[in-house]
């Protein structure tokens, strides 16, 4: 977690002590490439030698690291371009190319990052380098190419759980929630105490229409994650939804009470209305739930509305009977879709979450059609001016 969040300096050295004898399995277990690793049992001299080697490699990269730590990515990239030519060993070259690729990827320089990862793979076939290419495809909305490469990674390095997460995300983007859940469950079996992955699996089970299974994963996430820095209201909101859909009234009320003490401030008013609606839906109080969703719908144009918050709203609306008095599901979901939809994958994902409601699916498609027509008209006007 410290490594992925950047919570300690790039100049720090991370050495894994492990019983694994395959470098790829070490990398897979760590989900990112360590600076070095040493096998158990080992002597103090062996550890000293490995540490000395790791510090030598870090000193070689220090000029680039310092620029990155000062926020000067441009100078860091120029420095790394020079260091590639100065590398005297394959290991030094691989270290520079890895840092250069990660920097380009963070800056969304996808072509440059892709060239670096490809050059790394020419030196050595390493799972994290393939993972970098898969992330580039994902960022470019090339879902099929990304998924194909991720499946290759999983076949070659079945313990590389990060690849499972990204593949599951790709499947969910295409509305394939059952398949996404299946992939995540395999990853959880490999790393059963990973808080973030348990949350993702619970969310995926909700999207796949299995609230009982979602509750199991989310309850475990809450048990082991309360002291995790990433712990927050999101996992509790998903757990509330799971209990609501599964009809677990007592547990639903317990989670709702906890959320009422957490969701404070104007920026959380939308979620409070949605959570209240979830609780009322769990009791089948349709009219009261609709009123809460109506209050949430009035806030759909808020700038801070996130994709996940919007999806929670959609999933709650999809549980309302469409024949109750004053039903406005179509209007609400169309307005939501106008806010969230950008690509065809967005349409597939939202329509899959509409729980087979013909009215709501039509609302998503109508919004996408309106956006496409507006875009076509804008392009036409631009061409006319030329």
Language model features by range: what are they?
Residues 32, 69-70, 107, 174, ...:
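Charged, alpha-helical scaffolding/interaction elements associated with membrane systems
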Residues 15-17:
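Hydrophobic/aromatic residues positioned on beta-strands within the core alpha/beta folds
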Residues 47-58:
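Receiver (REC) domain switch/output surface
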Residues 110-386:
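Flexible loop/N-cap segments at domain edges
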Residues 8-11, 20-36:
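Alpha4 helix (beta4-alpha4-beta5 surface) of REC/receiver domains from two-component response regulators
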Residues 1-9:
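Short amphipathic alpha-helix used as the core "switch/output" element in two-component signaling
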Residues 40-41:
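A Lys-centered signature of the CheY-like receiver
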Residues 59-108, 115, 132, 377-385:
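Alpha-helical segment of the N-proximal tetratricopeptide repeat
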């Amino acid at each position: 977690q410290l490594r992925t969040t950047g919570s300690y300096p790039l100049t720090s050295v991370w050495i894994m002590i492990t019983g694994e004898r395959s470098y790829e399995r070490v990398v897979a277990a760590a989900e990112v490439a360590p600076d070095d690793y040493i096998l158990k049992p080992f002597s103090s001299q062996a550890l000293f030698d490995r540490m000395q080697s790791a510090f030598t490699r870090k000193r070689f990269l220090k000029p680039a690291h310092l620029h990155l730590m000062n926020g000067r990515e441009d100078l860091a990239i120029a420095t790394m371009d020079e260091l590639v030519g100065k590398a005297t060993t394959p290991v030094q070259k691989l270290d520079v190319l890895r840092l250069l690729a990660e920097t380009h990827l963070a800056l969304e320089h996808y072509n440059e990052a892709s060239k670096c990862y490809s050059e790394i793979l020419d030196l050595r076939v390493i799972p994290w380098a393939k993972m970098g290419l898969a992330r580039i495809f994902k960022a470019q909305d090339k879902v099929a190419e990304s998924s194909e490469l991720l499946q290759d990674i999983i076949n070659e390095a079945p313990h590389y759980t990060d690849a499972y997460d990204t593949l599951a995300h790709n499947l969910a983007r295409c509305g394939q929630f059952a398949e996404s859940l299946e992939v995540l469950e395999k990853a959880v079996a490999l790393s059963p105490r990973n808080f973030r992955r348990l949350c993702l699996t619970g969310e995926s089970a909700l999207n796949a229409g299995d609230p009982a299974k979602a509750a199991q994963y989310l309850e475990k996430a809450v048990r082991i994650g309360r002291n995790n820095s990433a712990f927050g209201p999101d996992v509790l909101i998903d757990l509330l939804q799971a209990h609501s859909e599964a009809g677990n009234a007592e547990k639903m009320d317990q989670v709702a009470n906890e959320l009422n003490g957490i969701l404070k401030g104007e920026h959380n008013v939308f979620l409070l209305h949605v959570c209240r609606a979830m609780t009322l839906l769990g009791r089948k109080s349709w009219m009261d739930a609709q009123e809460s969703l109506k209050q949430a719908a009035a806030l759909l144009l808020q700038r801070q509305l996130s994709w996940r918050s919007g999806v929670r709203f959609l999933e709650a609306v999809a549980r309302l009977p469409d024949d109750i008095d004053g039903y406005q599901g179509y209007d609400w979901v169309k307005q939501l879709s106008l806010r969230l939809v950008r690509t065809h994958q967005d349409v597939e994902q939202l329509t899959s979450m509409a729980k087979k409601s013909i009215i709501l699916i039509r609302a998503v498609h109508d919004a996408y059609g309106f956006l496409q027509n507006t875009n076509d008209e804008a392009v036409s006007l631009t061409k006319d001016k030329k």
